[in-house]
């Protein structure tokens, strides 16, 4: 191998290593909900869910794992307790497209355990999709950033009428074994989804 070929191969190897040495946590709220609550989506939410696979895969690539709350853990909705299936229903079309299971190990309010799972070193080179309740996603995002010494105030408040935002945390390796952590707010671009259910 001549010197030129060796240098090119070395640079390529470094680029591949650098590109893969990052975890990306992609967080989205469940899609639009029924006016009666019910723990369920409405027709617009269903249409958003059906459109999500193309959006998420194009923006972020295939995930290593998908997390949603355990639907058997009940949540109050309009004063009534229901099985909380909105997040799972939102991401199911994406999981089906990818041929992937959905991890529902944690109840909707158990963000402590969810956060610990997301920060497990096994995901250090992974893309993770998390679909959850928006207030809890906002809280967890701030907690993760704080744990790495970042200002939690950079995380905007998640508006109650906002079903389109995507919060993204990237945790990358850097010199000296430290982690470089960044946050960005993205969007699905699906607010104009049809309000009537597909035939």
Stretches found by the model and what they are:
Residues 131-133:
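Short beta-strand segments
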Residues 22-125, 136-199:
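Active-site-proximal alpha-helix that buttresses catalytic centers in soluble enzyme cores
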Residues 17-21:
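Sec/Tat signal peptide C-region and signal peptidase I cleavage site
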């Amino acid at each position: 191998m001549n010197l030129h070929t060796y240098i090119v191969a070395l640079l390529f190897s470094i680029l591949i290593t650098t590109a893969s040495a990052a975890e990306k946590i992609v967080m989205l709220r469940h899609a639009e909900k029924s006016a009666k609550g019910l723990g369920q989506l409405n027709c617009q939410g269903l249409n958003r869910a059906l459109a999500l696979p193309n959006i998420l895969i194009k923006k972020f690539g295939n995930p290593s794992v998908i997390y949603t709350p355990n639907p058997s853990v009940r949540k109050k909705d309009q004063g009534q307790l229901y099985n909380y299936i909105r997040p799972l229903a939102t991401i199911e079309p994406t999981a089906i497209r990818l041929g992937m299971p959905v991890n529902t190990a944690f109840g909707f309010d158990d963000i402590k355990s969810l956060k610990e799972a997301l920060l497990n070193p096994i995901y250090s080179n992974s893309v993770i999709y998390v679909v959850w309740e928006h207030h809890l996603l906002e809280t967890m995002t701030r907690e993760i950033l704080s744990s790495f010494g970042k200002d939690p105030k950079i995380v905007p408040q998640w508006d109650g009428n906002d079903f389109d935002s995507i919060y993204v945390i990237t945790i990358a390796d850097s010199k000296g074994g430290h982690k470089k952590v960044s946050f960005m707010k993205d969007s699905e671009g699906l607010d104009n989804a049809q309000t009537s259910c597909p035939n």
